[in-house]
């Protein structure tokens, strides 16, 4: 099925391009999300008329995504899962679980924008998850899968202390550069 993209989609193409996709993908995802329309002469002329508006809208979404990316920078999520003695969890970690935790922390993120990079999380440990906020903005966040609440609390305390010390070092470096600049 030929469609016209109404926004940049990393895997398909740029705004306004005519691309061929499977009918189910278009019907079930692209059309309902208003990311594309069917490629007809009517829609092509409409799109040309609306191109500037769509580009402005895309720039606004990009700016919102960049702001959200700043709030997710250095973000980590701790998941508590039941596991066997050798560290295998019962079941696996899903994108919905991560999206739910992020929502509880005030970040509204669709679970479909989360990607494990083709890896299935079935063991305790540390994992990298990519959050695609926009076709041009992908933010990595760290997922820690632990066995108990005490492990989770210890990990959170250690991570928060590390972030505070890094922040203090950055402030000291900035102050040092400011005072060095004043001496010249």
Swiss-Prot record:
Q: Which GO MF terms does the UniProt record name?
A: rRNA binding; structural constituent of ribosome
Q: PANTHER family from the entry?
A: 50S RIBOSOMAL PROTEIN L9 (PTHR21368)
UniProt-listed Pfam families:
Ribosomal_L9_C (PF03948), Ribosomal_L9_N (PF01281)
Instruction: Write out the entry's keywords from A to Z.
Output: Ribonucleoprotein, Ribosomal protein, RNA-binding, rRNA-binding
Q: Which GO terms describe its biological process?
A: translation
Give the gene symbol: rplI
Q: What is the lineage of its organism?
A: Bacteria, Pseudomonadati, Pseudomonadota, Alphaproteobacteria, Rickettsiales
Function statement: Binds to the 23S rRNA.
Q: Which family does it belong to?
A: Belongs to the bacterial ribosomal protein bL9 family.
**What is the protein's given name?**
Large ribosomal subunit protein bL9
For the keyword Metal-binding, the answer is no
Q: Where is this region: Disordered?
A: 160-184
List cystine links: none
**Could you name the Gene Ontology cellular component terms for this entry?**
ribonucleoprotein complex; ribosome
**Comp. bias (Basic and acidic residues):** 173-184
């Amino acid at each position: 099925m030929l469609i016209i993209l109404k926004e940049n989609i990393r895997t398909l193409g740029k705004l306004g391009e005519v691309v061929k996709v499977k009918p189910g993908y278009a019907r079930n995802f692209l059309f309902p999300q208003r990311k594309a329309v069917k490629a007809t002469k009517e829609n092509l002329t409409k799109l040309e008329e609306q191109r500037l508006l769509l580009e402005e809208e895309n720039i606004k979404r990009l700016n919102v995504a960049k702001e959200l990316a700043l709030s997710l920078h250095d973000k980590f999520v701790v998941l508590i899962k039941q596991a066997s003695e050798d560290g295998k969890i019962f079941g696996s970690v899903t994108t919905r679980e991560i999206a739910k935790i992020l929502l509880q922390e005030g970040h509204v993120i669709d679970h479909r924008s989360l990607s494990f990079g083709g890896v299935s999380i079935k063991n305790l440990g540390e994992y990298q998850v990519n959050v695609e906020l926009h076709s041009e903005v992908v933010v990595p966040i760290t997922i820690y899968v632990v066995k108990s609440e005490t492990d989770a609390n210890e990990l959170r305390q250690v991570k928060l202390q590390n972030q505070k010390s890094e922040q203090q070092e950055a402030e000291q470096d900035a102050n040092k550069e400011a005072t060095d600049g004043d001496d010249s």
